[in-house]
């Protein structure tokens, strides 16, 4: 009777895990959707909490900046959680894990489980990331599962969803009878109010982010939880904590005979042929317990000495990884001091000095997602290899709104400081200049005051002086030519955004 009640308890516990995974994935989606302009100058929800509880981002960022980042201290809770319940975060809470499990359930095919292809690679990548961070090369954001997920969603899938939805309802509005439109219109209004973004956005390297996320999902057809088992450095870090976890799954014994059904169905490949469960890899999904024919697998307190061997790195691999991490800045030239900064690399308002900004930026893409004007874009090689996917302002796409401070509010690491409105109005992110070979009053003698009309500074950073020019007909005429008041210009870029000429002006 006791065994039956215990069996029922674990079955309900497994169902609870599925509910937990679904709940936290939906919570992630909710916070993702709320990382957008909603008509308010402040963000109502802790939309950056996912990145603030990420131990990989927290540890690597603090190592890079050599200080404690208060914003990221919640990550300690996940570390403590892993010390008690092992790597259960990956099976119960992680939205990337929820996406992969849901994708396989809906679109995957059932196949025999296989041994993990590259069991040591996540630990190698983790060591490489942490040592590189110490020497000023931030790499965690490139492989962190949360950064990959949010970048792919915000820079490709979400804008694509909005484009398809708006196009569909525009088509129905134009072609359906008025009676049907009365039914369709409330549906669109509901989607616009609850799910769709404030405006249609486009990201110049969005397909790159989509490609990376697509590879992670497509790898499910190679092996279940391929990314989690073979690449994820966050999983490796939580796995290290799991080595001393107080609770874990306890595997079968010799009385199981030749069954080994648990090893064949384990989504993480955490059970070996001797039915020993590796706590460093096990995510406590409880599949093995539910499907064990003899109900011999249990969940209980386990001493570290009784655990599976886990994944260990040889001394040679460790030294090779450490050496590569040390020479990376020199070999790749990612931190050469004699390279002049690109004048067109304009960081968002509140950005710290470039070296510390790059060390703190985790490439989450939330500042770009929340940008009202779509002016913030991901940079590729313009900022060097270490600066890929970090944000910069492309004024031809959108300007920095004078009364907006949302990007600093969503930044999880403090790479972008939270500015008060008075500070924002004075914060200089760049400097405007005129291409006199193209600007209409200079190049063609045609009057134009568009840039000055849109300048948001109270005293107008763009001013005019009367000049005599020769127009295209060879006639002399007086034209007001613009110039920049350096003391007033904050580099918001609206003058370039609104300029009637195409291209750089």
Q: What role is predicted for each listed range?
A:
Residues 1-275, 280-281, 286-505:
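Non-ligating segments of multi-cofactor redox enzymes
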